[in-house]
């Protein structure tokens, strides 16, 4: 078995763990910030949320084994193990998308330390996109955690493969793409939220690092993040057109998934 196949297999195994954890985090955020305050008329205590976030809404059965945050919805066949009530389809979708993107990233990058920050970007991008699709918001905590994990991964990859100057590509990428999105946010905050700016900054970190070239230490990262912005705009335009046709009128739509998809495509293209 080749090294690439082993890495892909390991990435898929990792996705089996990461996918349910992402669902747990998404459910926690949606319940804490959106659903429970509407039901209770107040922000719930941590204990209230902790008792409900891994249980079936119908019968109260636990959906996670002891000591683990969640059990894969795919392994449960999308149903509660006790009352067999169908679980929300997006739980399985998050796990399947995470597994597919983990496998794709591992197949493209192969057995390299640079795979670590890409997997962190994928995990964070999936979580933020799921929330954005649900309520058109990108959790600040998700963005900060993803930025921290991606940065640590890039530092580790630079320490192993070098050169240290490549980290400047990450800085340039984050500054350029984050700055561009900030300007667009200031021009039209209704169409582009500040959460999108945070996500774009994280994407810029990875895209700038992978876009760095020894002969193009500045232009390379800038070109990479501009490509990411262009792809995001194209994906967003297509999504907006589809929604316009489906809904019959112009309405705001979540732009976070387009940024996440564009960032991953540019990173893999430069890997």
Regions from the language model: what does each represent?
Residues 1-110:
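N-terminal transmembrane signal-anchor/hairpin module of polytopic inner-membrane proteins
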Residues 11, 15, 19, 98, ...:
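Alpha-helical transmembrane segments in multi-pass membrane proteins
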Residues 19, 196, 254:
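Short, conserved phosphate/pyrophosphate- and ester-handling motifs at nucleotide-, phospho-/glycolipid
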Residues 23, 27-35, 71, 130-139, ...:
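Cytoplasmic membrane-interface segments at the C-terminal ends of transmembrane helices
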Residues 90-94, 138-144, 251-256:
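Membrane-interface loop-to-helix entry segments
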Residues 115-120, 124-235, 240:
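Functional transmembrane core segments of multi-pass inner-membrane proteins
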Residues 240-266:
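Interfacial loop-to-transmembrane junctions
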Residues 268-271:
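Juxtamembrane boundary at the C-terminal end of a transmembrane helix
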């Amino acid at each position: 078995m080749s090294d690439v196949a082993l890495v892909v297999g390991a990435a898929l195994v990792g996705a089996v763990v990461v996918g349910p954890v992402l669902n747990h985090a998404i459910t926690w955020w949606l319940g804490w910030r959106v659903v429970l305050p509407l039901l209770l008329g107040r922000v719930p205590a941590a204990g209230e949320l902790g008792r409900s976030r891994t249980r079936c809404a119908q019968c109260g059965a636990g959906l996670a084994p002891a000591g683990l945050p969640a059990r894969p919805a795919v392994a449960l066949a999308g149903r509660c193990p006790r009352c067999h009530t169908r679980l929300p389809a997006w739980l399985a979708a998050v796990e399947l998308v995470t597994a597919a993107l983990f496998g794709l990233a591992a197949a493209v990058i192969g057995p390299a330390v640079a795979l670590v920050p890409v997997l962190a970007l994928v995990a964070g991008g999936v979580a933020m996109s799921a929330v954005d699709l649900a309520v058109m918001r990108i959790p600040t905590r998700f963005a900060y955690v993803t930025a921290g994990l991606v940065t640590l991964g890039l530092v580790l990859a630079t320490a192993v493969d070098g050169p240290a100057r490549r980290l400047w590509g990450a800085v340039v990428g984050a500054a350029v793409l984050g700055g561009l999105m900030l300007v667009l946010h200031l021009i039209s905050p209704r169409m582009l939220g500040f959460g999108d700016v945070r996500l774009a900054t994280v994407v810029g970190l990875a895209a700038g690092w992978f876009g760095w070239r020894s002969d193009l230490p500045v232009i390379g990262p800038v070109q990479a993040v501009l490509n990411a912005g262009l792809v995001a705009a194209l994906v967003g335009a297509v999504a907006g057109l589809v929604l316009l046709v489906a809904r019959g009128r112009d309405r705001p739509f979540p732009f976070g998934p387009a940024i996440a998809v564009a960032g991953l495509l540019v990173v893999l293209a430069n890997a």
